[in-house]
Amino acid sequence: MTVLIEAHGIHKQFSGVPVLRGIDFTLLSGQVHALMGGNGAGKSTLMKIIAGVETPDSGELNVEGKPFARLKPGQAHQLGIYLVPQEPMLFPNLTVRENILFRLPRGNDPEKRLADKLQQLQCQLNLDAAASTLEVADQQMVEILRGLMRDAKILILDEPTASLTPGETERLFRQIRALQDLGVGIVFISHKLPEIRQLASHVSVMRDGAVVLSGETTQFDDTALITAMTPVSREQGLSDTQKLWLALPGNRRTQAQDFPVLRVEDLTGEGFIDLSLEIYAGEIVGLAGLVGSGRTEFAETLYGLRPTRGGRIWLENQEIGEDSVLTRLEKGLVYLPEDRQVSGLFLDAPIRWNTVALNEPSLWQQRKREAAVVERYHRALGIKLNHPDQIVRTLSGGNQQKVLLARCLEANPLLLIVDEPTRGVDVSARADIYQLIKSVAAQNVAVLMISSDLDEFPGLADRVLVMHQGMFSGELPRHAVSLDRMMALAFGGQS
């Protein structure tokens, strides 16, 4: 196998803080090279430098033997380098077809090539739909197709399966293997060890801006990889200090009630029909299903972002079906959205402002309180930051997710709806978030958790509701929650 790209001694700083410290990295043709690391380790920054999106402070890139001090995005594309970002970046008002073919040369019948790619992926994308209507999983597939249509020799996949269902993941893996046979080199950034072992012949682990482990995947067991990412052994539970810092700010809930926090009767809306459920204080209810089953649409309707077409919603025995989003929020219904960069965070605002954005205090107490709130969640969640005024866009994906979680908790929820809360989050941070959800529920907050990673529900959810084509196909109590049963119900079968 020939060397496609080599990075030598790459250094990079943001605001005087080193994020890459002398990185060396090599990718061969036909190789899947996995890149692991905790949140803020520098993985995405390194890949953005290779793709020409960021400029290194020092170091050199060699692409098929040609040296470059830096690359520009257009130059990287011409060299066959394509980055599929963790957060899809599509033109929302263009169609799927227009997004995929944007600025692609007209020769070689692109429409036919696109049809062939879709068939190879067994992908059911509606090419005439507006990109803004797609769920995150479908947006991810559009990004991947963009790269494939540009005959990428070097394909960088940043957490490509984070929001894909098992079936979509397996189809993607088949396409990756086909690309390997064509000599395409693939950098596969993931936190999912089974996927890395299934796909990657080589693995590199980054920590604090440096490569701390690299070699053939078979050389290392899971413990070695996790230890390299997180050098300090972490308990699965939160420490007493963290629990203290995570105590919710208000006193809205002190004890469980004998009536449900949320009651929904025959609710119909965009993407779902006749849904009924009850969630009680202190209960964690999982909402499983395939992408397109209507889970996110249901959550957004509960929050008031989408209109209802029928049915009723009660929050603590108060009907809220006609309430605005702001009124529902004031009553304690808080929603953590699926796409943190588009729907969740104010990326160009400071961390302190993002953290209290849902319950802004009066101006005279604002700044002092914001600093105290950021300090609380910095300690409790381990948010990696330099200072409260740091712009959210400069944080790693996992730390952005923690800021969004902090904002939701600071809003003093009665019902917390979390949509894909661990998307793009590393192994140790996932454990923190799971324990955080348990800690919140222990304070008698009702939690509705949506996840495409079905392995998250056993041991976490008190029960799991499964959706199929906009309807509930079944409910599993804690003792019956298993991957096989959830998958069977998600495909419309029996558990």
Curated annotation (Swiss-Prot):
ATP binds at residues 37-44. Its EC number is 7.6.2.13. It is an enzyme of class 7 (translocase). Keywords: ATP-binding, Cell inner membrane, Cell membrane, Membrane, Nucleotide-binding, Repeat, Translocase, Transport. It catalyses: ATP + H2O + (2R,4S)-2-methyl-2,3,3,4-tetrahydroxytetrahydrofuran-[AI-2-binding protein]Side 1 = ADP + phosphate + (2R,4S)-2-methyl-2,3,3,4-tetrahydroxytetrahydrofuranSide 2 + [AI-2-binding protein]Side 1. The keyword Membrane applies. Coiled coil: none annotated. It comes from the Bacteria. Residues 5-233, 256-494 form the ABC transporter domain. It is found in: Cell inner membrane. GO terms for molecular function: ATP binding; ATP hydrolysis activity. GO terms for cellular component: plasma membrane. Signal peptide: none annotated. PROSITE patterns: ABC_TRANSPORTER_1, ABC_TRANSPORTER_2. It is a peripheral membrane protein. The keyword Membrane applies. Belongs to the ABC transporter superfamily. AI-2 autoinducer porter (TC 3.A.1.2.8) family. PANTHER family: AUTOINDUCER 2 IMPORT ATP-BINDING PROTEIN LSRA, CARBOHYDRATE TRANSPORT ATP-BINDING PROTEIN MG119-RELATED. The complex is composed of two ATP-binding proteins (LsrA), two transmembrane proteins (LsrC and LsrD) and a solute-binding protein (LsrB). Part of the ABC transporter complex LsrABCD involved in autoinducer 2 (AI-2) import. Responsible for energy coupling to the transport system. This is Autoinducer 2 import ATP-binding protein LsrA. The gene is lsrA.
